[in-house]
């Protein structure tokens, strides 16, 4: 079976490094980005199976990136796990464009992996 590709958009380098190490230890291909502009420029070419995205990025709001993703027919189906230290699931799911799942920071590694495997089942890749 081919390795699954996971795109992580997170501005905190320590969190990005931890998520990358965890996912690579589970045999995923991981690409990490620090800025929303990088996401917009590279998401189509990366063609991820799952996206993990922080809501609060230095150059944009992750919810704006999610709207951009959902508007692009070629990648609109990609499952997205939003993460945030400032929002909780109740507040986040009230937004008009909800992600496939949400996780508050700091997070539990087992919970992160459970959510990723559940999202991979949704992925059409």
Tell me what each language-model feature is.
Residues 58, 76:
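The feature encodes the CheY-like receiver
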Residues 107-118, 124:
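C-terminal output helix
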């Amino acid at each position: 079976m081919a390795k699954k590709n996971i795109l992580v958009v997170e501005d905190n380098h320590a969190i990005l490094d931890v998520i990358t190490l965890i996912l690579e230890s589970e045999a995923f291909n991981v690409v990490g980005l620090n800025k929303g502009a990088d996401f917009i420029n590279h998401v189509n070419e990366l063609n991820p199976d799952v996206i993990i995205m922080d809501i609060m990025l230095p150059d944009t709001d992750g919810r704006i990136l999610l709207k951009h993703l959902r508007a692009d027919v070629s990648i609109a189906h990609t499952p997205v796990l939003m993460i945030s230290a400032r929002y909780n699931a109740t507040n986040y799911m009230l937004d008009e464009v909800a992600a496939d799942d949400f996780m508050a920071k700091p997070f539990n590694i087992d919970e992160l992996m459970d959510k990723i495997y559940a999202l991979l089942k949704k992925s059409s890749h």
